[in-house]
């Protein structure tokens, strides 16, 4: 949810010589529609079920960096499934920093688009509060605050090789 997972993931994959998969893009390709459209047509529950199935389809991939959606770890035991299948990285960001990143792209994010700017920060705080218990299970936690993407991807790479 705006922490830079996809951008950092692409850089990380390049540094490691790995392939890169963005789960949101994979979902949109498989379902031939945007996540926003899917939410509108089928709702969040259906989206989360399909997302969990798609995540499990990535099990056969090797040497691949996978950027999940922000909610992916929080449903259908996805985080517990991801942990033995790879190294999970949580890019930690404070709510206000996420707000500043998301304020101009909230229309592309189904869980945020109905919120006016005044209530957006509160929604982000609530989502983080609900999701934190899952994010904290990650193998690696790195602050994404005030760090250039190139530096962030290098920090993640260093942490992975230390594991």
Across the structure, where does each feature detected by a protein language model lie?
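NTP-dependent small-molecule kinase module
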Residues: 15, 129-163
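Walker A/P-loop
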Residues: 6
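Short glycine-rich anion-binding loops that position phosphate/pyrophosphate groups of nucleotides
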Residues: 70-72, 94-96, 147
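A glycine- and Lys/Arg-enriched "phosphate-lid" helix/loop adjacent to the NTP-binding pocket
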Residues: 85-130
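ATP-binding Walker
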Residues: 3
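ATP-dependent small-molecule kinase phosphotransfer cores
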Residues: 23-83, 108
